[in-house]
């Protein structure tokens, strides 16, 4: 059995040889690996036999998953967006990953929107984000916000590689359901990326850990606690074969929840001391959020930290101490809750604690000493491995998988065997969940089962597809449904309806039903129609994304041409005012002529802050036309050549 699975998966990771493959690899170009995180994202590429984690334009190897829209029409993504959160909280969007692929009625969505500074609205039974842009209020699907972050990672990679990138491997939490996986793929399409593979974050981290491990078979537990999600996966690693044995987790648990506990504590404390409730003041809340996050990070290395915020609320300052002990007390139940999935994974894998050879901690929240201590104690004092960077491991593994798919050298020995995280089945009489594919089944996989009708002469059966672990479908998650019609009249129990489930390498499900008597067949790819974007939606969002990119480009051109004129005018003004330099060489008439032209340009700038780039360029040319002859005359008098002007003619001069 294992051999068959291995063969299937070897085919799936694209390890076939021959000319056809080489041609295909050329078409793909360089495939990048992206860790699309709740709070931070990271991008890597496999080049020349090694992984490069790529720094963004700020020099940072991780980029905040933040998007902001400013009052002057600028769209900011990453560090720039996060840096202005406290001054523009209503139009700074984060945590899109906590909304993506979820329904409006989801209890987690309803919990989260109470704490977001931006407005979340219902549209087509799904959460959408409403912000003010320069064109007025605009509503975005979570997929669009995630697409903007993916687009930023794509740009970061393109700047490093010096060429366009069109294909990517994107990671998701292992416990993401079908709808969340589909929505993440859609976000990639909107960003102009073909997502070749969705892989699970702990699996990617295991690749990062185990890539160079050659010492025989090892059982590795990956404990991945990030900013917004938590996963545990147990893998067997053996000479380049990565087999996921079991996985579990919580798609709504992470560093942000720890921050929120601390914030709630300080908000209550402030109300008790000052009698003031800051919850309605978005700016104050976001200032507190920023400082609490910093304090949490500091407490990983020290035992207490002082939180100081000037002009916190209604002119008052904020000054409080947070100790590591208090931080742990506020979050102890959440920290302890991470051990339940660890226990579950061991049970599902039919292993004991002592069977685990290595524990790999991934995600920024595993830097919290108490989390490390709890994991260590759970495994009887076993020290977790510290060989990989918890912030970069997932992107690293994604980049390796991207290298495999694009046929990079030295990757042909890597085989990835992942599993589906949740049981999948259909509803049968009485609302019973009949399982077809149990959780932790190696994917890709296909499973069929024959069913029959529940009543005499029934000519239609409705196939309702669910995922979840509960015995009754009402307690599980409906993925989609379809009808098989035209069943010939027959007593109940006679017709034979074969239902087949097929899960692809991305963990995405296709279901078909066939009437064995007539050969009549229906099938659907589960796209969670109520939840999923339609192809029309995606096309519209792609157009919107392109429009935003054009607007960003135009804005950049406008800002650059404005800056050129401004710097030129002020630089001249300063030089003319300098009595030791240019100011001393000009006659009063020349000085007055230049000052008058410069003042006119500065006045025009103040009156036209949003002019077109061409207008700024024309103003600069006009100013140069007045300035250049005066300066040229000075240089000729001194027997030298005039300095190059700032206009187009500068390019014609010989270069040294």
From Swiss-Prot:
Question: What residue range is the signal peptide?
Answer: 1-18
Segments of this protein annotated with the region Nucleotide-binding (NBD) = 126-280
Keywords, sorted A to Z? ATP-binding, Chaperone, Endoplasmic reticulum, Hydrolase, Nucleotide-binding, Phosphoprotein, Signal
Source species taxonomy: Eukaryota, Metazoa, Ecdysozoa, Arthropoda, Hexapoda
What is this protein called in UniProt?
Endoplasmic reticulum chaperone BiP
Report the main location listed first in the record: endoplasmic reticulum
Q: What EC number(s) is this enzyme filed under?
A: 3.6.4.10
- Location of the region described as Disordered in the Swiss-Prot/TrEMBL record: 634-656
Naturally occurring in which organism (per UniProt): Drosophila melanogaster (Fruit fly)
InterPro entries given in the database record:
ATPase_NBD, BIP_NBD, Heat_shock_70_CS, HSP70_C_sf, HSP70_peptide-bd_sf, Hsp_70_fam
The UniProt gene name for this protein comes to Hsc70-3
Q: The motif Prevents secretion from ER: which residues?
A: 653-656
From the UniProt entry, list the residue stretches annotated as the region Substrate-binding (SBD). 420-500
- What family is it from? Belongs to the heat shock protein 70 family.
Instruction: Enumerate the residues binding ATP.
Output: 37-40, 97, 227-229, 293-300, 364-367
Task: Give the regulation of activity.
Answer: The chaperone activity is regulated by ATP-induced allosteric coupling of the nucleotide-binding (NBD) and substrate-binding (SBD) domains. In the ADP-bound and nucleotide-free (apo) states, the two domains have little interaction. In contrast, in the ATP-bound state the two domains are tightly coupled, which results in drastically accelerated kinetics in both binding and release of polypeptide substrates. J domain-containing co-chaperones stimulate the ATPase activity and are required for efficient substrate recognition by HSPA5/BiP.
Q: Which PANTHER family match?
A: HEAT SHOCK PROTEIN 70KDA
Chain's role: Endoplasmic reticulum chaperone that plays a key role in protein folding and quality control in the endoplasmic reticulum lumen. Involved in the correct folding of proteins and degradation of misfolded proteins. Acts as a key repressor of the unfolded protein response (UPR).
The GO molecular function terms of this record are: ATP binding; ATP hydrolysis activity; ATP-dependent protein folding chaperone; heat shock protein binding; protein folding chaperone; protein-transporting ATPase activity
- Please outline how this chain is modified post-translation: AMPylation at Thr-518 by Fic inactivates the chaperome activity. In response to endoplasmic reticulum stress, de-AMPylation by the same protein, Fic, restores the chaperone activity.
List all Acidic residues biased stretches. Answer: 646-656
